[in-house]
Amino acid sequence: MRFSIQREALLNPLQQVVGVVERRQTLPVLANILVQIDQGRLTLTGTDLEVEMRAAVSVDNAENGAITIPARKLFDIVRALSDGALLDVKLGGDRVSLHAGRSRFTLATLPAEEFPTIDEIDLVDKVQVPEATLKDLMERTAFAMANQDVRYYLNGMLLDLRDSGLRCVATDGHRLALAETRLDNKTSSARQIIIPRKGVLELLGLFSGGEGEATVEFGRNHLRVRRNEVIFTSKLIDGRFPDYEAVIPLGADKVLILEREALRTALQRAAILSNEKYRGVRLEVSSGRLRIVAHNPEQEEAVEELEAETSVNELAIGFNVGYLLDALGSLGDEKVKMQLRDAQSSCLLQGAERDQVRHVVMPLRL
């Protein structure tokens, strides 16, 4: 096996593939990437057995073959080469040599046969989604995913495929984020899958937000996303996601409309004196005004007052200020709408004019 390639042509696909490779592995071969040459095409594959990333690029002076090479070392070498360098790669025995100008490197390898790959998935459905749209949906909801929760099905994101379109939903049990879009190409059936947290983060890193289309393939146990020369595959979380629609407080009659940026900056200031552990702030509504109050164990206090469009006369409720700030940061609207039933119920937060992005935040007892 041998090939030649410009540094810049190799660096981008290599960077995408190396991202999924964990630094500490139980299997030595998982610290490597699979390098395959076939008919002048170089395919790079990295995996951690949960997520797989595969990228392809054309090369010169190619001889077919396959081997696995230490991922991090190869990436560091290519990144450190001079701009415009031509890299020659040649396999000899159980070593691979890399030549670029006056630089020469020799790396240990492992057989390609030892590398675990996901070749085919049991495809049950697929949709075309604008890349920028899918990235936007995931960015607006990913922050609400749980991390290492014993309820393993919360450690990821729900993709809810339905007749009307696609929804991305994430929750950690304390707050919920939902974003949806309509799809031009209707799906054959409704379907729900849960992508693990790492898969979501890798997908967000993969998307550039360009104008292209991403093909999303739904398998029984896997999700696959095809984008240009890159194929991303992730195992799915085998669990049942909570009935998130039951969590959304529909029909909440206590409504406040506020300037998003004014509310966000007021909460940021109040958060300075909130309890560092619970991050609690108290929202007090009366006579067209919202009062934000924060205290800490040192008996220090922060008070912020904002004008609000509301018919609510008297209401006081506590929230984790970090959850409110995350939700507001996800909304792009000038004005936001807060909807509540009472002082013990959750808050529905969305744009004042549209509801494609919705957030639910559970209250705190202060």
Where are these regions (language model features)?
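Structural preference for solvent-exposed beta-strand-turn elements
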Residues: 1-366
